[in-house]
Design a protein with these regions (language model features):
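Mature catalytic domains of secreted/periplasmic carbohydrate-active enzymes
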Residues: 1-142
Length: 142
């Protein structure tokens, strides 16, 4: 999922994804995970955890739900971000990394929870330093 909120996998927690909201209607990440496994290649996910321009409460997104209710980042985190990170760390077999991106001013408690989910579900996976608050396994430029 990039900042636009569109998941390039079959997300059960949000319908704005390649299977349910596009004519492609297949899960390319499932196919890629299988192909990487067959060829002995590492596999992982990119996930923009702070920004979501289309989901209420996501950084850069709407501040109200469709029915006009004001929401905070916590709403986005609990209803989209956390469920999707659980999905990508449980539905695709062993993964080698999760590349979080653009933490911005995301509170440390949220980053800690995401890191804990990855560590629990994929204990061998590396986490990018762009998770935020120095909680990743490696640093990257950009």
């Amino acid at each position: 999922k990039h900042h636009d909120g569109f998941a390039m996998y079959d997300s059960k927690s949000n319908d704005f994804n390649i299977v349910k909201a596009s004519p492609f209607a297949r899960d390319p990440m499932k196919e890629l995970a299988q192909a990487c496994k067959e060829e002995g290649l590492g596999f992982g996910f990119y996930y923009s955890h702070n920004q979501d321009w289309t989901f209420p409460g996501g950084n850069g997104g709407p501040t109200t739900t469709e029915d006009g209710k004001e929401v905070s980042f916590d709403y986005y985190f609990k209803n989209k971000c956390l469920p999707q990170v659980k999905e990508i760390t449980t539905e695709y077999g062993d993964i080698d990394f999760v590349w979080f991106d653009t933490p911005g001013e995301m509170e440390k408690k949220y980053v800690e929870e995401l890191v804990a989910v990855v560590r629990k579900n994929q204990p061998k996976a590396m986490i990018s330093g762009r998770a935020g608050h120095g909680l990743g396994d490696y640093q990257s430029l950009g």
